[in-house]
Amino acid sequence: MEHTYQYAYIILFLPLPVTMSIGFGLLFVPTATKNIRRMWAFVSVLLLSMVMGFSVNLAIQQINGSFIYQYLCSWTINNDFSLEFGYLIDPLTSIMSLLISTVGIMVLMYSDNYMSHDQGYLRFFAYMSFFNTSMLGLVTSSNLIQIHIFWELVGMCSYLLIGFWFTRPIAASACQKAFVINRVGDFGLLLGILGFYWITGSLEFRDLFEIVNNLIHNNGVNFRFAILCACLLFLGAVAKSAQFPLHVWLPDAMEGPTPISALIHAATMVAAGIFLVARLRPLFIVIPYIMNLISLIGIITLLLGATLALAQGDIKRSLAYSTVSQLGYIMLALGIGSYRAALFHLITHAYSKALLFLGSGSIIHSMEPVVGYSPDKSQNMVLMGGLKKYVPVTRTTFLLGTLSLCGIPPLACFWSKDEILTDSWLYSPIFAIIAYFTAGLTAFYMFRVYLLTFDGCLRVHFQNYSSTKRSLFCSMSVSVWGREPLKIDNQNLPFLILKRNINNNKVFFFSFFSKGTYKNKIYNNVINRMQYFRTYFQNKYTYMYPHESENTVLFPLLVLVLFTLVVGLIGIPFDQGVIDFDILSKWLTNPFQKNLNHSVDWYEFLTNAIFSVSVSLFGLFIASIFYGSVYSSFQNLDLINFFVKRGPRRILLDQIKNVIYNWSYNRGYIDIFYTKGLTMSIRRLSKLIQFFDRYIIDGITNGIGVASFFIGEGIRYIGGGRISSYLFLYLSYVSIFLIFYQYFDF
């Protein structure tokens, strides 16, 4: 066991050779490096698998003994200052390293196929390996200065990966936005580190916690200054984990490749802020008001993220706001003191969200041959629908990930979210009500994403859909807020309609690849008969329907499904009696504080679970009403209009729906406020400063220079040695003297 801890530093350096090898290879032997480019994916997966094996070994030892190991090496030694670097192995380190390595392996395997067509394939894997290295260095850091170094490296990698397709202006703008917002948090983090070093004289975690605890209890430090430093530290976590009000960068980070989105949202970028708060929890507990601030930011973020996800049309952006909301749950749990539930939900959410993002990438790839390679089309859920027929494996995995995030048992997120909801009720009934309400919203918008993507039939060849109009072929329900009547895009329609007999309700179809005519009374059956046809229109082939992804893409999805099914079982919270299966109570313990007993009895667990699941099921039901194909069928039969007549209540309901839609679609007007209130103000100020600098400061300097030039030229001309010039100057002086003498009458 000692040898395992002594050589734990290799966790940090194992993924690094891939980045260095690709970099030197592209620099010195670019042709050979590009010829064997697919080999680098295998090497990346192999090295990260070694990290996973090492992390599993550490996790087993932590579960059995919770042994803490710290190694320090001094870099600078003098009487006043000592800078030490090392690594810390504790339960938090082991769980984070295992999470990073497992999700990272799945993302790398997925990326080999997903990015195979991209010219930046090698650059992508170099960035990914360095991203994993930076995150592993962050979670193994033994002091605050190391955390800050790797914190900056994580931010740099996210900047490079979000702007991976930097030739696209929107991607370049997104990575700049993420970089600038994280600069705000990083500046606060650095000031907080310097403040606590000034208070304690140490940057090591154990010394820092002990000294601050003693100073607080003995009134040996200014409370206001300590609170300020703690708030600055928390500001870094707010920016990195996309908490309100610095959350606006995360939805725009979707401009990067989809595997990057999965890694950022699951195990790296956003997990860094959660890790920092979890690591510094013993420090935050003893400082007044900080835990209240953390819980307040968490409750605001979880509600805000859920409301902003309600009306998004981009599948990746909807998942991004879902991440914001779920991170709010984790931050709330940390703020109310539920350390175990917070880390538990971090684990379950990571696997579920990685599954959803990789599934969305499979969906996007299947839609690209149909709608084109523009993200505005391939990621637009309005153009999807009915994909369950064409991508059945992706649909099944996406459904399981959706139900997990909705909190449906026995999937992973049910266990962790239910524990957070229960603990929040003990902390504050108001917070609990908001958390339960947001759980219902989560089920609503996540099932909305699923229904818009997989339910109904493919809408790519139709325009201006309406939830109140009937399609010629199937029932559609796209937006709860309503749109214009349905129009058929005749130019892109992949089949030809010869005749429609309304009286006997028959539709006749003709295929260019068939001599016969197909008849059917049921629209869905007609579509099933045509799903493999291809037609030739306007000198181009049009593939009618998407297709399932390749096995190298589906395999990571199936593995993540397995994690989603079983990872929640390690945290069974109720009392098991003689045999204790609660691995989390042994594993997810705070290394610097005594762990609490988290077991509950069966009755309490079932009571809380029934209520939380009922809320989630209600959200699923509402989503199926507004977006399901069954509801649209009722609308087509005018049953809804028969029971719900136009009146004051209906008008009020429409107004409420429009307000919610505008709030969600415009991102809560927060981006608009930042753009007009901050960005435009800064630009106007910069233009004013530029004018002042160019025309005032430079004008004075240049004016003095020009005046000096003309004076010098005049003196040089007069003093050139010509007698005529001297005589002219003399006569001028005499004339001026005589004029003054005559005028003033001296």
UniProtKB/Swiss-Prot annotation:
EC number assigned by the record: 7.1.1.-
Keywords attached to this entry: Chloroplast, Membrane, NAD, NADP, Plastid, Plastoquinone, Quinone, Thylakoid, Translocase, Transmembrane, Transmembrane helix, Transport
Entries under InterPro entries matching the protein: NADH_UbQ_OxRdtase_chlpt_su5_C (IPR002128), NADHpl_OxRdtase_5_subgr (IPR018393), ND/Mrp_TM (IPR001750), NU5C-like (IPR003945), Proton_antipo_N (IPR001516)
Molecular function via GO: NADH dehydrogenase (ubiquinone) activity; quinone binding
A single cellular component GO annotation: chloroplast thylakoid membrane
Classification via Pfam families: Proton_antipo_C (PF01010), Proton_antipo_M (PF00361), Proton_antipo_N (PF00662)
Listed Gene3D superfamilies: 1.20.5.2700
Record GO biological process: ATP synthesis coupled electron transport; electron transport coupled proton transport
Topology relative to the membrane: Multi-pass membrane protein
Ranges that cross the membrane: 9-29, 40-60, 88-108, 125-145, 147-167, 185-205, 225-245, 258-278, 283-303, 327-347, 354-374, 396-416, 425-445, 554-574, 610-630, 726-746
Compartments in which it is found: Plastid, Chloroplast thylakoid membrane
Main subcellular location of this protein, as a coarse class: plastid
Catalysed conversion reaction: a plastoquinone + NADH + (n+1) H(+)(in) = a plastoquinol + NAD(+) + n H(+)(out); a plastoquinone + NADPH + (n+1) H(+)(in) = a plastoquinol + NADP(+) + n H(+)(out)
Record's keyword annotation contains Transferase: no
Domain of life the protein comes from: Eukaryota
Subunit structure: NDH is composed of at least 16 different subunits, 5 of which are encoded in the nucleus.
Protein family per UniProt: Belongs to the complex I subunit 5 family.
Role of this protein: NDH shuttles electrons from NAD(P)H:plastoquinone, via FMN and iron-sulfur (Fe-S) centers, to quinones in the photosynthetic chain and possibly in a chloroplast respiratory chain. The immediate electron acceptor for the enzyme in this species is believed to be plastoquinone. Couples the redox reaction to proton translocation, and thus conserves the redox energy in a proton gradient.
Protein name: NAD(P)H-quinone oxidoreductase subunit 5, chloroplastic
